Amino acid sequence: MERIISELEMPNEIEIQKSLRPKSFDEYIGQENLKEKMSISIKAAQKRNMVVDHILLYGPPGLGKTTLAGVIANEMKANLKITSGPILEKAGDLAAILTSLEENDILFIDEIHRLNSTVEEILYPAMEDGELDIIIGKGPSAKSIRIELPPFTLIGATTRAGLLSAPLRDRFGVSHKMEYYNENEIKSIIIRGAKILGVKINEDGAIEISKRSRGTPRIANRLLKRVRDYCEIKGNGTIDKLSAKNALDMLGVDSNGLDDLDRNIINSIIENYDGGPVGIETLSLLLGEDRRTLEEVYEPYLVKIGFLKRTNRGRVVTSKAYQHFKKVEVKI
């Protein structure tokens, strides 16, 4: 079932999300510290007539890692090639991409933490020395051939930086953490998106959507489209505070951007374990959700807004969450 506040990209929204992506740093809203550092790196590289150092972008999904890779490519006037860790199953898969690169190309590998070790080892000499070692043949007759690669930049993206091996992580010259966006930045993203989509919206309407967007541009753009649909049918076509509130309430997204699944996680810990602590494996079984999905997709936002704590003994619901859900906290 579609989860409207999922940070993950849905297949049916890929094209429209592309249309909303900024093309330059001037259009890119938020991540100011990161933008300044990257802008300096790019200008310095251009001044020296060199490629930018390899870049690692990490942070929760939906914050614009792919978008930023596109912006960097545009600023460098470079071609961008996109792939992902799970797709590159064999060393030959990555070798084929590397040998197709042209000078100054940018290779973007999403979910780079999911590369298997055999594929990952191909990257080491490619990143460090601009060389690709290929084994031709098998057994005693096998030969190693070294191919010189043109200068290129690798941009790796991950939601789990801690899962990267040290040898791979150390080969990135630049490493940046993508931060959640504040409400004002999200509001600006919504107003920009509305303009591109031809949607009428006032500032109060944009603020109401931004408060429920979980600090994530991908979610903000998705909610904007849903509220637009609601206003076209049940409103006057213009998104204001009341129409945005009514639409999002109907969609089950509350004032903190929480949905039924978030509420189920918190309520399950409260009702079954008096608020915790409860181990992640137990919680996974209780909710019928994969452990990795809980850790990577569901928990980060609950932790960010102070509703859930990760402790050595397990997950614990906070007093702030009890107040939000109007539950009576059990003191032990």
UniProtKB/Swiss-Prot annotation:
* Biological process, per Gene Ontology: DNA recombination; DNA repair
Q: Which Gene3D superfamilies match?
A: 1.10.8.60, P-loop containing nucleotide triphosphate hydrolases, Winged helix-like DNA-binding domain superfamily/Winged helix DNA-binding domain
What is the enzyme's class at the highest EC level? hydrolase
For this protein, the record's CDD domains field holds: AAA
Q: Where along the chain is ATP bound?
A: L20, R21, G62, K65, T66, T67, R171, Y181, R218
What EC number(s) has UniProt assigned to this enzyme? 3.6.4.-
* InterPro entries in the record: AAA+_ATPase, AAA_lid_4, DNA_helicase_Holl-junc_RuvB, P-loop_NTPase, RuvB-like_N, RuvB_C, WH-like_DNA-bd_sf, WH_DNA-bd_sf
The function of this protein is:
The RuvA-RuvB-RuvC complex processes Holliday junction (HJ) DNA during genetic recombination and DNA repair, while the RuvA-RuvB complex plays an important role in the rescue of blocked DNA replication forks via replication fork reversal (RFR). RuvA specifically binds to HJ cruciform DNA, conferring on it an open structure. The RuvB hexamer acts as an ATP-dependent pump, pulling dsDNA into and through the RuvAB complex. RuvB forms 2 homohexamers on either side of HJ DNA bound by 1 or 2 RuvA tetramers; 4 subunits per hexamer contact DNA at a time.
**How does this protein assemble?**
Homohexamer. Forms an RuvA(8)-RuvB(12)-Holliday junction (HJ) complex. HJ DNA is sandwiched between 2 RuvA tetramers; dsDNA enters through RuvA and exits via RuvB. An RuvB hexamer assembles on each DNA strand where it exits the tetramer. Each RuvB hexamer is contacted by two RuvA subunits (via domain III) on 2 adjacent RuvB subunits; this complex drives branch migration. In the full resolvosome a probable DNA-RuvA(4)-RuvB(12)-RuvC(2) complex forms which resolves the HJ.
Provide the family line. Answer: Belongs to the RuvB family.
**Record note on domains:** Has 3 domains, the large (RuvB-L) and small ATPase (RuvB-S) domains and the C-terminal head (RuvB-H) domain. The head domain binds DNA, while the ATPase domains jointly bind ATP, ADP or are empty depending on the state of the subunit in the translocation cycle. During a single DNA translocation step the structure of each domain remains the same, but their relative positions change.
Q: What is this protein called?
A: Holliday junction branch migration complex subunit RuvB
